[in-house]
C-alpha cells in the first residue's frame, strides 16, 4: 500500500515579482521549509514543513510572503472533520501519540464571553480613576480570621496578631510557571524583569533555577513538581514563595515531558539530568498519595524555609476540584492555583489537552463557594490560570472568587509568540520555546521585558477603569462579588454553578 501523504496545514505563497532573492526566509526558517533553487533562481517552500509561525513573513523586506491556512477540502461530513482525518493519517504512519503545545483550541465556547459586568449610574456614582485613588494591590497568602490590636502605655497602637507571610502584588496578575527548558532563558529573563518592574511575580516552573535568575528572588516563585528537578534547600529559599505542582490544566492526570532535543548542556546542569535525554516528571508525586502526604510535604517545605514564605499548591481544574482544593487548604496550603482546561503547555498529548478538565470559570466559582461553606476561605488565596486573555477576564475571574490570576500564553504572545503549537519541537523561530543559541538570540530580554511590562500596565489601567465604572475603588471589594456579574445565553444550571444571575435580572 502506498504511503498516504498528510496534507500540509499551511501554505506559503510567495510573490515572485516582489521577491528580491535575498534568501532571508531560507536562512531564518528553523524548520527548513524554505529553500533556494539556483538553477531556476527561485525560492520555494516545502509546505509540509511549515508550522505557521509567520517568522519568514515578518522578516521579508519586500512583503513578498504570505502564510495562510491550507483549505483541506473533503466531502462535508459533520462527524468526520479534517482534524480527525489528519490525526488518523499521522497515527497510521507513525503509530505514536500526537503531541501538541500551547492551550486547548477546541471550539468549546468561553464562559468569560457569556458573562457581562455591571456599571454604576445615578444612585451609586461611578469613580474616575484618573482623579480619585484606586487600589488594585492585592496580597497572596493565608489571612487571619480576625485581627487583634493592643495599645502601649504611650498610646501607640500595635497589631497583636501575627500575620502569615504574604506576596504583595501591585497588579493582580502574575506570570505563570514556565520552566527553563520549555522556554528559553531570554524568555524567562524577559518575564522576570517585567515582574520586577511592575511589582508582581513570575514562576520558575519545574525546571530548576538558572543562576541568572537569582537576582530576581523578591519577585520569584519557585516550583516543586513530581520530577523534583533541581530541588534543594537552597532552591526552596531562593524565591519569595514555593509552589507544589500537583496538576496542570493542559494535561491533568499525567506528568511533565521535556523532549530530549531541548535538554542542552545548560538545561542538563540545571535539571541535573544527562544531555539529550527526555526530562520526564511522573504523573503522581511518589510521596503523595493522600491529603496527609500532601500536608507532610507542605510542612517539610515550610520547615526548610523557616516559615518565612507562602507555600502554594497547584491543581488542575477537574470534576472534583472543590473538595481537592478544600483538602489542600486544610493540609496547610497558603494559596491554591487552579489551572483550567484552556491552560497552556510546552508539550502534551493532544488527546489529553483537548478533552480532559473543565473550564476555569466553573472551577474558581465552585472552589470559592466550597471554601466559604466550610468557613476556610480566609485560610488560603485563590489564583486562577488557563486561558486568561485580557483585563476583562481578570476582572470576571476575581468577581467569581479569585484573588489574582496567572497568565502564560498572553505573556508569550507579548514576546512574539504566534501560537504555532509546536513548542515541543524546540525550533521556535521567535526564540521563545527553544534552546538553540542561534534562535534564542532573536529574543532580546530587554525588549521582551518592556513589552511584557507594557501589557501588565495596560491591563492595570483597564482594570481601574472598569472598577471605577462599577463604583468600586478597591480590588478587594470585587473578590467574590458575583452580584456585579450577569450571564448571557447560559442555562439555569450553569448560572447556578457560577453563582450569578441572568442578564436583565436586578439586584
Curated annotation (Swiss-Prot):
It catalyses: 2 L-glutamate + NADP(+) = L-glutamine + 2-oxoglutarate + NADPH + H(+). SUPFAM superfamilies: 4Fe-4S ferredoxins, FMN-linked oxidoreductases. CDD domains: GltS_FMN. Its EC number is 1.4.1.13. The keyword Cytoplasm does not apply. It is an enzyme of class 1 (oxidoreductase). Its cofactor is FMN. Residues 10-39, 41-70 form the 4Fe-4S ferredoxin-type domain. [4Fe-4S] cluster 1 binds at residues 19, 22, 25, 60. One of its GO terms (molecular function) is 4 iron, 4 sulfur cluster binding. [4Fe-4S] cluster 2 binds at residues 29, 50, 53, 56. Keywords: 4Fe-4S, Amino-acid biosynthesis, Flavoprotein, FMN, Glutamate biosynthesis, Iron, Iron-sulfur, Metal-binding, NADP, Oxidoreductase, Repeat. InterPro entries: 4Fe4S_Fe-S-bd, 4Fe4S_Fe_S_CS, Aldolase_TIM, GltB, GltB_archl_type, Glu_synthdom. The keyword S-adenosyl-L-methionine does not apply. GO terms for biological process: glutamate biosynthetic process. This is Archaeal-type glutamate synthase [NADPH]. It comes from Thermotoga maritima (strain ATCC 43589 / DSM 3109 / JCM 10099 / NBRC 100826 / MSB8).
